[in-house]
């Protein structure tokens, strides 16, 4: 049996991964997300964009995978499982999943905004949250930026290609913790259904996918995923 997992913000929320509006220190809540997550915002103030992403980078580095992440990693030891995520954290990887196809980039990867070469050098320290941080500079003179898909940017070719390939050939797709409204990722469950796959939605709240999903489970990732593989035969009867 081949399984694809499509994960969204809900699974990471259980690990207390902060969102934009979760800013406890008050530095970022006053900014429009577009100012910090777009090429226009980057061009206007790269130091502020770096401050925002470096703050998130270090916050996420200090949280841990939850039972949902660990369950998915355990599945990979038993059956063929492809992990596709809209999240920019590394919690799937730290739980043991591999490979993980990041559709929206990663807080833990960086590249030059000018020549696109990957950056593996040191990051600025952030012992306390600050509003602006000088970006590292590439050998070509360009500024290093987070490898995140910003507003208006296309998805990275390779992760998207692999996500589509896995979706087209899967037997079961588990859609966990995603609102199912952000395209093109929201189109993957539709593609799976069109190819005859079973689509299982795991979300405490209904989403636009609910009416079309084969099965909808109104639980969180940590509640539903640890026992889901064993429950599949009964669920699919």
UniProtKB/Swiss-Prot annotation:
One GO CC annotation: cytoplasm
Annotated NAD(+) binding sites: 8-28, 86-89, 177-179, 203-205, 221
Start and end residues of each Deacetylase sirtuin-type domain: 1-235
Keyword set includes GTP-binding: no
Chief localization: cytoplasm
Chain positions recorded as substrate binding sites: 53, 56
Membrane spanning stretches: none
Cofactor: Zn(2+)
Residues that, per the record, bind Zn(2+): 112, 115, 138, 140
Subcellular localization(s) per the UniProt record: Cytoplasm
EC number, UniProt record: 2.3.1.286
Annotated function: NAD-dependent lysine deacetylase and desuccinylase that specifically removes acetyl and succinyl groups on target proteins. Modulates the activities of several proteins which are inactive in their acylated form.
Protein name: NAD-dependent protein deacylase
